[in-house]
Amino acid sequence: MTGHSGIVLYRGPSQITGAPIVAIATGLQAARRQARAGVNAKTGAMVQVYILAGGRDPVRAHQSGADAAVCGDCIHRQGSCYVRLDQGPLQVWRAYQRGRYRHASLQVARAALAGLPVRLGTYGDPAAVPTVVWQTVFAQSATHTGYTHQWRTCDQALAHWCMASCDTADETAQARAAGWRTFTVVPTGAESGPDRAILCPASEQAGRLLHCVDCRACDGRAGGRTAHVWIPVHGVQHKQVRFEQLITIGRASC
């Protein structure tokens, strides 16, 4: 299966809601060419894993609320998610519907991703997929990045592969107390993040010093790192505004 650009890693019930979902790894050929050529990773590609609700395309899933199967209770479902559903997620969904991606056993998937950098959850929360999938497919991958907003309720073993996505100082403190490394989004204009956290080196504010595949900070506990990470809210302007509205509403309701 090494000649395929993408494979289905998982097809089954969501670990969040029980509804059908599919997890698809894309960009394998590009990542493999980069690995063989020894190209500077700053200019290269990571394998992208999309976690999509089954039965309808991502745009309609969001409109109907069916995206809860892959996004859970993430606050960014309310209009502040930086992901453009009509772009990557919809394109992958349509390709999947055309039969472009073959289903791979976990053993085949592990071999296909061996030596490659993987971005876990380009869209969708990794907690929606059984942890054994990540445990198996990442066994030989070069590196990975991963984030989950479901850190309170998911399989806590996921902390080995993922950062806890946090949107407030309180969430950050709670996630750390539960044993997670944290990735905290802060409002636009914030000059600093939580204590013991570094500014994301791939962010605009840091001068885009490193690409994620070079930095490797956001790999949960897998790499033995202890630092936490923060980043100012990003994406198109109206989504940044929506994020700050949601955070303000959340604080007022506490």
What residue ranges belong to the model's regions?
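Class I S-adenosyl-L-methionine
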Residues: 1-253
